[in-house]
Amino acid sequence: MKRGLRNGVAPCIPVAFCRDAGSAGHGATEAARPERSLQARGFASGMEARQGGDNFAGSVHDSRPARGDARKRHCQENNKTDRNQGSSNQSQNRRKKRIIKGKVM
């Protein structure tokens, strides 16, 4: 491939993919810039758009374990039937028996 067909800033990306970058100069496409799309939705300045993006990213990252736990609890609460409760009692009884056997030995 000729050197002239490549992007000078990011040589591994062909220039054809960087046409939409405009004056950005770093090879980012319009979809990769959340500030612009947020401004189009009614945010007044880029700073507000950036703050919203950062807060959203942080909250998603911080809440992943809690969301997983909540889903498990939700499924368990919805699926409680007599059969399921009986099986949970059986597993608790098994645990108790194992503990008792462990103490005897």
Curated annotation (Swiss-Prot):
> Region labeled Disordered — which residues?
22-105
Alphabetically sorted, this entry's keywords are: Plasmid
- Source species of the chain: Escherichia coli (strain K12)
What's the protein called, per UniProt?
Answer: Uncharacterized protein YubN
Judging by the UniProt lineage, the source's domain of life is Bacteria
> What segments bear the compositional bias annotation Basic and acidic residues?
61-83
- Give me the stretches of Basic residues compositional bias: 93-105
